[in-house]
């Protein structure tokens, strides 16, 4: 394994120079004649403790009890599990010491029955170099001996294991430090973590003499009597993500409920059967769909037979060719249109999964936005297989289906058929609530309508959505977040991204809110 002891010794020296009292606890002795960093630490007179001279770990236990900061600089990239022998025992002692320091307060409860808020942190802050010792950097596997960190500092580029669980859950906040690596070294890498600089470059300009057509027209087919909120959230997100005009095509029976909340949209009222879109509504869309720059299909549609028939009719003969069929009866036949760039979400995906040869029915350049359950249905495989290797599965299916795929979840994956892949740097339990997927789909279709390519719209939309989610969580915590809270912060997320100067370090660094 590639060890990080040298990095730890350098950190010890700089901390000492800054005035900290530093002790270095080493698993094995170092030779100062060949280890320059160890020699410099010795010359500074820093305390050096050896595991080989600490048979019952008493000195290690005492050091952890007294420490304000613990720096884990043992194992790095190249680690293979399991961790064994003295190293496993050493990490176990550190973990036990930290756990003892984290014991809850023994003070009496307040009159309301709640424990008092702590005045200050009373246990060490753990910093991991590259990652906790015991993290496998390719798979994200985490040894049981690993010590979870509060902050992980890695260099040049993040590693795949930083975004795969369970290891990703043990990093705390992740910081990618710029060490002057030549960008040309990564020029041919197709897998990237989305950064603010990337999103800023993709977002369209907003000229002073613009009109609403400048920023695109988005058509959203969504909603049913049981899911009025999905239509509202998707439509409102599209307006908040910059689309010039948003039209909601929805069952006429829910129009009043949605329009009362979303006054900025226009509406196309569709025929319905008991509150769900009816099959013959396809001919109504056929008369209007070519007026729009992007189409979102699916949020809250439901899966009734009428709606399934509607989706089948709408997609009949798609694939980018002018279609020679008709929608409706002979008396009211309307030529099938060429669909604008398409985003499919939620029940649209579930209906696709029930159709034979569904990938051939989609126009090129479509974006599919499944959560793991929907992805499993589209693939015909169990969810466990989807989650086992999210990056590889998303890349494979994007190529197989010939469309951009957005696999939602902690560290959302965006993959294009040509192999380009983005990992979105957000893992937020507050987004695990109803409606947040509708907000994401609305953001993506808005960016597609503004002229972004399918991959760029998907990656940028997921970044805006994730950043808005993190802003919401920072303000109100994860437990009480709603999709509407995230929706309200989309403009702030956009402003935050475009407000960052291109010379800032934010483009090469990544900060994540700590877990919990």
State where each predicted segment sits.
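Radical SAM [4Fe-4S] cluster-binding motif and immediate context
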Residues: 207-271, 278
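Short pre-catalytic strand/loop immediately N-terminal to key active-site residues, enriched for Gly-Thr
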Residues: 207, 422-435
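Glycine-rich phosphate/dinucleotide-binding loop and adjoining beta-alpha-beta core of small-molecule
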Residues: 3-187, 249-426, 498-499, 510-516
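Short, small-residue alpha-helix embedded
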Residues: 376-377, 433-464
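Phosphate-handling active-site elements
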Residues: 15-32, 448-461, 470-475
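Charged C-terminal helix
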Residues: 467-516
């Amino acid at each position: 394994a590639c060890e990080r002891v040298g990095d730890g010794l350098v950190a010890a020296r700089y901390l000492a120079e800054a005035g900290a009292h530093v002790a270095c606890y080493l698993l094995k002795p170092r030779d100062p004649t060949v280890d320059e960093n160890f020699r410099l630490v010795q010359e500074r007179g820093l305390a050096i403790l050896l595991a080989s001279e600490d048979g019952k770990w008493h000195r290690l236990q005492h050091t952890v009890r007294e420490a304000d900061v613990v720096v884990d600089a043992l194992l790095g990239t190249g680690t293979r599990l399991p961790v064994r022998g003295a190293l496993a025992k050493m990490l176990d002692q550190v973990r036990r010491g930290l756990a003892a320091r984290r014991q809850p307060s023994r003070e009496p409860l307040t009159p309301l029955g709640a424990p008092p808020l702590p005045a200050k942190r009373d246990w060490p802050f753990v910093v991991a170099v590259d990652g906790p010792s015991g993290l496998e950097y390719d798979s994200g596997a985490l040894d049981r001996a690993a010590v979870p960190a509060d902050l992980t500092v890695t260099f040049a580029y993040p590693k795949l294991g930083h975004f795969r669980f369970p290891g990703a859950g043990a990093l705390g906040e992740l910081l990618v430090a710029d060490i002057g690596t030549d960008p040309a070294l990564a020029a041919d890498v197709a897998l990237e973590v989305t950064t603010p600089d990337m999103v800023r470059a993709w977002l369209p300009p907003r000229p002073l003499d613009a009109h609403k057509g400048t920023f695109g027209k988005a058509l959203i087919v969504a909603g049913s009597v049981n899911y009025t909120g999905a239509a509202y959230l998707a439509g409102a997100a599209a307006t908040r993500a910059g689309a010039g005009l948003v039209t909601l095509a929805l069952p006429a029976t829910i129009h009043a409920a949605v329009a009362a909340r979303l006054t900025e949209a226009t509406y196309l009222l569709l025929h319905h059967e008991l509150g769900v879109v009816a099959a013959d509504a396809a001919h109504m869309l056929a008369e209007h769909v070519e007026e729009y720059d992007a189409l979102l299909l699916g949020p809250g549609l439901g899966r009734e037979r009428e709606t399934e028939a509607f989706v089948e009719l709408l997609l009949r003969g798609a694939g980018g060719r002018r279609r020679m069929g008709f929608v409706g009866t002979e008396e009211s036949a309307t030529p099938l249109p060429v669909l604008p760039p398409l985003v499919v979400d939620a029940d649209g995906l579930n209906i696709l999964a029930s159709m034979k040869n569904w990938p051939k029915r989609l126009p090129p350049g479509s974006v599919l936005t499944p959560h793991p359950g929907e992805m499993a249905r589209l693939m015909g495989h169990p969810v466990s297989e989807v989650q086992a290797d999210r990056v590889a599965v998303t890349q494979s299916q994007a190529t197989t289906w010939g469309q951009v795929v957005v696999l939602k979840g902690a560290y959302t994956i965006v993959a294009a058929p040509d192999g380009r892949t983005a990992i979105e740097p957000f893992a937020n339990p507050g987004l695990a609530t109803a409606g947040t997927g509708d907000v994401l789909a609305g953001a993506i279709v808005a960016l597609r309508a503004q002229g972004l390519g399918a991959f760029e719209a998907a990656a940028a939309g997921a970044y805006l959505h994730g950043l808005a989610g993190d802003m919401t969580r920072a303000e109100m915590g994860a437990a009480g977040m709603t999709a509407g809270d995230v929706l309200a912060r989309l403009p702030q997320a956009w402003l935050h991204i475009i407000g960052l100067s291109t010379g800032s370090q934010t483009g090469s660094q990544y900060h994540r809110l700590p877990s919990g």
